[in-house]
Structures are given as structure tokens and as C-alpha cells.
From Swiss-Prot:
Residues 1-19, 72-100, 148-152, 213-221, 278-300, 342-358, 401-419 are cytoplasmic. CDD domains: SLC-NCS1sbd_CobB-like. One of its GO terms (molecular function) is cytosine transmembrane transporter activity. Required for cytosine transport into the cell. Keywords: Cell inner membrane, Cell membrane, Cytosine metabolism, Membrane, Transmembrane, Transmembrane helix, Transport. The gene is codB. It comes from Escherichia coli (strain K12). It is found in: Cell inner membrane. This is Cytosine permease.
Length: 419
């Protein structure tokens, strides 16, 4: 097995852990993404002013709680999402969530590259293929340097996006008559509140399932909860507000489009580039960790390979794969639910990653994911929340029953090895 400073095959040592501020910037860099603005635009034009804020705050609170669980587990153990999955899915069984998580992140990376290149190409007249090649290369080179590079990039990007985007929103709202005029807007096609909540939670629950990949570098597990809450409850909410304000004022959800319409071309390119760069690098970093769990290769090398694939296929992914990626992403929330459920039941096993005896494949975990997907699809309520709870509850109920002998045997062996 190849080792690298991404610690893709074992826990992050205390000497490599980082402070809460650095991780907060990294996680905000993940959640500052154009797709959340687009969803915010949909909500802003489909809900009243007060219902919009209620949906955004409740939805992102639920998202924050979910990611906080995963962040706590990641920081407590120092393990990636994929190594955590070994405890519940089995060593080879964890390849399934790793393939699902890693594959979707490569896909979204390619989509993100195209999301930058296409509007910039239209605004400047530059060749879109050239923009894709250059931006994809820059993003791929950055991720090669691991969590430290992600931190530096996010420290630059997060304040820039917040300040420039905030200024643009202020101009847009003032241009339509101020906050009172914004409050007075009546939705032409009202959106059901439960659908709105599902859109908010669903906007980032796929990437949120990978929270442990980043927060495992935290020195304190309790502070990891704070990091996840700030990123998803505050950071994601800000993107929704940007999108809603832009859509209400100028009919454009992406803040970079609003800025171009305002004549702020260079700031728009900066905001769009940094916005996508930070999220894409996090996606590429996480994809490398996923495929490292399957292959045992260096996650650095795999991230670079994934970046090249995503860049080459960017336009095709953008034009043909978004619907498929969205479908695949619906299968991801139950994976997080199963990981959380197993940790709650067997947290002492997680203290000894190197010596813990694990199953090859735990079919109960895979069944629980399938039941979680079914719960999300068929049960009334908030789809991604139902999927997480369906996966977690199915695992909590079925695993002790169907794996009683196996669990007892592993617990006995581990108890003897600790003694």
C-alpha cells in the first residue's frame, strides 16, 4: 500500500492535526458553490420572503446536524469516510460506497470545470475548451498538495466570495427598491414547503456525507461539530441568500451572472472561479481518498488521475451527466446513516483501527442502504432526511439480528487482543 500525507490508509496522527479556524475555512470553501445559489434562486422565486428564510434555516440546520455527526466521528477517529465505512460495510464491502462517493465527486468536478468555463467564455469571447483545460489543470495541481493547499486556497477564496458577493447583492436589492420591495415579492408559481426543505437538504447532503474526509484533521472532536455547523448552517445559507436575492432582483440566481449584468466583469470571474475552485478541489481530494480505499494506491496520484479524467470529460459531463449524478447522489445519504448508526452501536471498536477485526462484506449494511433509498423515495416527508433515517434505523435493527454470531465473535477476539 502506498502512503501519502493525505493519510488515506490510516488515522491522521495528532502531529498532523489542524486548528478549528483552518478547517472552518476549508469547509466553507466546500459549501460556497454555485449550485446552492441556483437552488436558492428556485426557492427565492417560489416562496414568500419569510417562508424562504424558514426553509433555508431549517433545511441547513438538518444538514448541519447530519454533517456534525460525521465530523465528530471523523475527528474522533482521524479516519476518512471510506475507512469508517469498513467498520459497517466490511473491508471489501466499503468499496461500494467508495465507488459511489468517489465516482460522483469526479463527475461533479467535471461539471464544475464546465460551469466556470462556459459563462466566462461567453462573457469574454475566450475559447471554452482552452478555459476548461487551464482551469481543470490549475484545480488538479492544487489538490496534489493536499489539505494544506485546500486551506490556503479557502483562506483566500472565502472572504473574497463573501465580500464581493455581498456587495453585489446589496447593489441588486437596492436597485429593485430595497428590502421592503424584496419582502413584497409574491411568488408567481408557489413551491410546496416540504419540497423546498428537500431541495435545501438535498443541495449538499451528498458532499456533506464526506465531511469526515476533511474534519478528521481536527484536534478536537467537539470543535469539529462547530466547524460542520458553521459550514453548512451558515455557509450554505449564505449561498442560498445570494441566489434568492439575485433571482428576485435580476432573474439570475448565480451571483457571478448578477455581477456581469451589473458591469462587474472581473470581480464576477474572480468570484465564479474561486467559488468553483474551492468546491472542486475538495471533491477531487475526496475522490482520491475513495479510490485509495479500493486500490491501496496513493490518494494523491488518484486525485490527479481523476482530475485529468474530469477535465477531459467536462463538457460531456455538463451536457449529459448532471441528471445521472443527481440520481446517484440520492443513494449517498443512507451511507452516512449507516456509518453513524454503526458508530453509535460500536464506538469502542473505532479506537483500534489497526487491530480491529472486520468482515469482508457486510450485506446488512448494503441492504440498509437499499432500504434507505426506498424510504427516501416512497415515504412522505423530506426525501434526503428519510433516506438517512431509513438507512440508519434499518442498520440499527437488522445488523444485531442478522449478524449476531459474527459480531459476538469479533467482539470476543478484539477483547482478547486488547487484553
Amino acid at each position: 500500500m502506498s502512503q501519502d500525507n493525505n493519510f488515506s490508509q490510516g488515522p491522521v496522527p495528532q502531529s498532523a492535526r489542524k486548528g478549528v479556524l483552518a478547517l472552518t475555512f476549508v469547509m466553507l470553501g466546500l459549501t460556497f458553490f454555485s449550485a446552492s445559489m441556483w437552488t436558492g434562486g428556485t426557492l427565492g422565486t417560489g416562496l414568500s420572503y419569510h417562508d424562504f428564510f424558514l426553509a433555508v434555516l431549517i433545511g441547513n440546520l438538518l444538514l448541519g446536524i447530519y454533517t456534525s455527526f460525521l465530523g465528530y466521528i471523523g475527528a474522533k477517529t482521524g479516519l476518512t469516510t471510506h475507512l469508517l465505512a469498513r467498520f459497517s460495510f466490511g473491508v471489501k464491502g466499503s468499496w461500494l460506497p467508495s465507488l459511489l462517493l468517489g465516482g460522483t465527486q469526479v463527475g461533479w468536478f467535471g461539471v464544475g470545470v464546465a460551469m466556470f468555463a462556459i459563462p466566462v467564455g461567453k462573457a469574454t469571447g475566450l475559447d471554452i475548451n482552452l478555459l476548461i483545460a487551464v482551469s481543470g489543470l490549475l484545480m488538479t495541481v492544487t489538490v496534489f498538495f493536499g489539505i494544506s493547499a485546500l486551506t490556503v486556497l479557502s483562506v483566500i477564496a472565502v472572504p473574497a466570495i463573501a465580500c464581493l458577493g455581498g456587495y453585489s447583492v446589496w447593489l441588486a436589492v437596492n436597485g429593485m427598491g430595497g428590502l421592503d420591495a424584496l419582502k413584497a415579492v409574491v411568488p408567481a408559481q408557489p413551491l410546496d414547503f416540504n419540497v423546498a426543505l428537500a431541495l435545501v437538504v438535498g443541495s449538499f447532503i451528498s458532499a456533506g456525507t464526506l465531511t469526515a474526509d476533511f474534519v478528521r484533521f481536527g484536534r478536537n472532536a467537539k470543535l469539529a461539530v462547530l466547524v460542520a455547523m458553521v459550514a453548512f448552517f451558515l455557509g450554505n445559507s449564505l449561498m442560498f441568500i445570494f441566489g434568492a436575492a439575485g433571482a428576485a432582483a435580476l432573474g439570475m440566481a448565480d451571483i457571478s451572472d448578477v455581477m456581469i449584468a451589473q458591469g462587474l466583469l472581473l470581480p464576477a470571474i474572480v468570484v465564479l472561479g474561486l467559488n468553483i475552485w474551492t468546491t472542486n478541489d475538495n471533491a477531487l481530494y475526496a475522490s482520491g481518498l475513495g479510490f485509495a480505499n479500493i486500490t491501496g494506491m496513493s490518494s494523491k496520484t488518484l486525485s490527479v488521475i481523476n482530475g485529468i479524467i474530469g477535465t477531459v470529460c467536462a463538457l460531456w459531463l455538463y451536457n449529459n451527466f448532471v441528471g445521472w449524478l443527481t440520481f446517484l447522489s440520492a443513494a449517498i445519504p443512507p451511507v452516512g446513516g449507516v456509518i453513524i448508526a454503526d458508530y453509535l452501536m460500536n464506538r469502542r471498536r473505532y479506537e483500534h483501527f489497526a487491530t480491529t477485526r472486520m468482515m469482508s462484506v457486510n450485506w446488512v449494511a448494503i441492504l440498509a442502504v437499499a432500504l434507505g433509498i426506498a424510504a427516501g423515495h416512497w415515504l412522505p416527508g423530506i426525501v434526503p432526511v428519510n433516506a438517512v433515517l431509513g438507512g440508519a434505523l434499518s442498520y440499527l435493527i437488522l445488523n444485531p439480528i442478522l449478524n449476531r454470531k459474527t459480531t459476538a465473535a469479533m467482539t470476543h477476539v478484539e477483547a482478547n487482543s486488547v487484553e
